[in-house]
Amino acid sequence: MDKSKLLDQCGALGEDRTLLARVLDRAKQASERNIPAATDFLSPAQQAQAADLLHAAGIPETAYIRWGGYDGAERAVLLFLPDWMDPSDAGTYSPIRCLRAAFRKEENLTHRDFLGSLMGMGIVREKIGDILVGPDSADVLVLDTVAEFLAQSWESAGRVKLRVAEIDPGCVHIPEIRREERRDTVSSLRLDAVCSTGFRMARGKAAALIESGRVQLNWREGTKPDRTVSEGDTVSARGFGKFELTEVGALTKKGRIPITVQCYK
């Protein structure tokens, strides 16, 4: 199947179509030239779209790895591997570099401050990976194509002065993930029922939210309230955050299902 038909099959439109076309180009480059080839940074939803597209193209998951610069990264590149490369060596060919932007602790800078500053310098989102903000510094994963420019030219976030230096990605400061555990019983594992617990809202409101297209199940849009959620699945909604269904218990005597969700703050 040619590229255009593959993109049509996956329903790719607009910016998503352009992005996914580049993913196929990188896969082709690695295969035909037998060299490592990486995409730009992709969001979790874009990674899911890309995985579906590559599956439709007959490209196995063993042909590429997801890598964001550190274990557990949310934004990641897809690095396509040539035949001669062992996946364990892929980090050597990673296009990801890390900048540490230090600031005075009392300034209380946020993720939004750093992202806004970078985009104000003309750096597009796909060149920027995770931004890990600590009390007095932020570690920013970027592509090698912009790393040197930023190391030399990035001086402030808003009115706050920054001291920027490149560090080894293996030295990133990973903030502790803030999560809240919630336990409940539900009548079924339908998406609307589980969202009612995860987002603390009435089931009818959860169903309406799903039908509006604002909810994603494992980073894929889920517009059907009756879709089944399985243990280990991640559910997210614009404006409401995300949660993971971490445990499904045995049916109670009253016919309800105990569940545990981890809500990310």
Indicate where each model-derived feature is located:
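Ferredoxin-like alpha/beta domains used as RNA- or RNAP-binding modules
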Residues: 1-198, 221, 228, 241-265
